[in-house]
């Protein structure tokens, strides 16, 4: 399906929403003074800095408080708040929603388009100034990529993939969408790029070696990077074939980790989707101790999402240990949530990195610099430096002391624009929409049947 169909639907959507979320563009000169800067390079905190933003670009980063020059500019005293590069969520599906996927699959294209945009814009308010889509039907992600780029509304940067490329009978490869053999794989990759994809997502678990090589070679010849939904032994095969990044990496082995470190392959573990009952309880106990459990609705729904994807203790332990090993080996890590809402689950993914043994600094780099490097835009994004675009997150507390201080976000800037931090009047939070769906009927039985794992931590009140 050509993405213009989704864009046509999006045109109606923008007309409905534009009155409340009009893109203004970076205007004039803004100075953020008395800022403590964590620049995303791995360098220590730069204390007492002043950041000058001219339009969309950082034009000054100097030590000391701002000294008035007589020129007209807006000066914002951050009073010691912490500034990082904008966060990236590198594994996003804009329209899917655990545990309701099966009941949302029948929704109209228009409903899916609207849900995708609301999800993306709420992610921006949580500090995620850029998203990488990793599999989306009807080119809905491309439609929103173009809508935000063209300024219809203020939203995050989207690096869209369109639909995943998978062989027939593979994961995400039904009869209508599957691509089999080298010729079909090449055509599938080219058609997605022709329709606006900036990323190619493949599912290589069931791919033959020549199909895998064809997918990577074709995308690279067109200047587009490739990421793979993969589990062992397909992880090793993909890395050996030159894949740019690995998603999930189920059953990741020491041999694959060593090869990834050697070849510079990026790893997006989506660890938040690989938790056992023990780890879910560990997470919620920790957040409660830090005072982040006051929002009963958020706690209830993020827990429901977690149990919708609960894994066995053995699986969860292996994935946690693999992430720690990858970090220690120097594999370049990426932050990706897989589940939504993008903002809350993205925060949980960053927190889960630290619970898995990754340092706070390396976690921030995985959410800022590394994504920009992978996507080839490190000259413009990913760090707080002069000459780069002003995608910034301002927090009242230091995330290097406790990663959960990312929850103290005070301001977000995208292209130098200060993002409104609350939904427009009269609109719902994403969690309000999620809550309105109610507990999904028969979800637990269906998911257990598919996974072969009996979920012990049933939050649905019986079977």
Segments predicted by a language model, with ranges:
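Histidine-rich, glycine-flanked metal-binding segment
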Residues: 25-28, 37, 41-84
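Metal-associated gating/positioning segment near the N- to mid-region
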Residues: 81-152, 171, 210, 236-241
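Histidine/acidic-residue-rich catalytic or RNA/ligand-binding cores of hydrolases
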Residues: 98-101, 141, 211, 236-242, ...
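Active-site gating/metal-coordination segments in enzymes
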Residues: 169-214, 248, 297-302
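Active-site core of metal-dependent hydrolases
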Residues: 202-316, 340-341, 372-375, 393-396
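His/Asp/Glu-enriched, well-ordered alpha-helical/loop segment
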Residues: 313-398
């Amino acid at each position: 399906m050509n993405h213009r169909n989704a864009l046509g639907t999006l045109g109606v959507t923008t007309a409905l929403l534009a009155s409340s979320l009009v893109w203004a563009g970076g205007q004039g000169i803004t100075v953020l003074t008395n800022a403590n800067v964590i620049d995303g390079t791995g360098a220590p905190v730069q204390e007492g800095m002043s950041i000058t933003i001219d339009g969309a670009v950082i034009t000054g980063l100097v030590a000391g408080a701002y000294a008035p020059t007589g020129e007209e500019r807006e000066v914002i005293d951050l009073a010691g708040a912490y500034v990082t590069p904008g966060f990236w969520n590198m594994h996003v599906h804009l329209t899917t929603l655990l545990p309701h996927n099966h009941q949302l699959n029948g929704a109209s294209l228009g409903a899916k388009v609207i849900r995708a945009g609301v999800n993306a814009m709420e992610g921006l308010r949580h500090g995620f100034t850029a998203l990488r889509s990793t599999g989306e039907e009807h080119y809905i992600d491309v439609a929103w990529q173009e809508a935000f780029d063209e300024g219809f509304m203020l939203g995050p940067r989207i690096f869209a993939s369109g639909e995943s490329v998978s062989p027939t009978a593979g994961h995400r490869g039904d009869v209508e969408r599957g691509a089999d053999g080298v010729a079909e794989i090449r055509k599938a990759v080219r058609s997605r790029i022709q329709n606006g994809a900036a990323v190619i997502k493949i599912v290589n678990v069931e791919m033959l070696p020549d199909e895998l090589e064809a997918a990577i070679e074709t995308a690279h010849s067109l200047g587009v990077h490739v990421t793979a939904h993969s589990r062992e032994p397909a992880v090793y095969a993909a890395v050996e074939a030159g894949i740019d990044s690995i998603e999930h990496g189920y059953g990741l082995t020491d041999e694959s980790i060593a090869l990834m470190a050697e070849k510079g392959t990026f790893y997006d573990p989506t660890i938040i989707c690989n938790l056992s009952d023990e780890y879910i309880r560990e997470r919620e106990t920790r957040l409660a101790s830090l005072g982040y459990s006051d929002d009963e609705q958020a706690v209830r729904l993020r827990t429901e999402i977690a149990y919708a994807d609960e894994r066995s203790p053995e699986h969860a332990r292996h994935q946690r240990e693999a992430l720690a090993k990858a970090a220690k080996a120097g594999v370049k890590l990426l932050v990706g949530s897989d589940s939504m809402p993008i903002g809350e689950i993205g925060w949980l993914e960053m927190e889960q990195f630290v619970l898995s043994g990754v340092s706070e600094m390396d976690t921030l780099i995985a959410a800022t610099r590394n994504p920009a490097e992978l996507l080839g835009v490190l000259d413009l994004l990913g760090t707080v430096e002069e000459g780069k675009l002003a995608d910034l997150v301002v927090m009242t507390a230091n995330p290097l002391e406790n990663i959960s201080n990312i929850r103290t976000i005070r301001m977000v800037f995208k292209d130098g624009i200060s993002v409104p931090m609350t939904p427009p009047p009269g609109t719902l939070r994403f969690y309000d929409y999620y809550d309105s769906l109610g507990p999904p009927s028969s979800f637990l039985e269906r998911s257990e049947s598919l996974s072969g794992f009996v979920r012990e931590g049933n939050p649905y009140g019986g079977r």
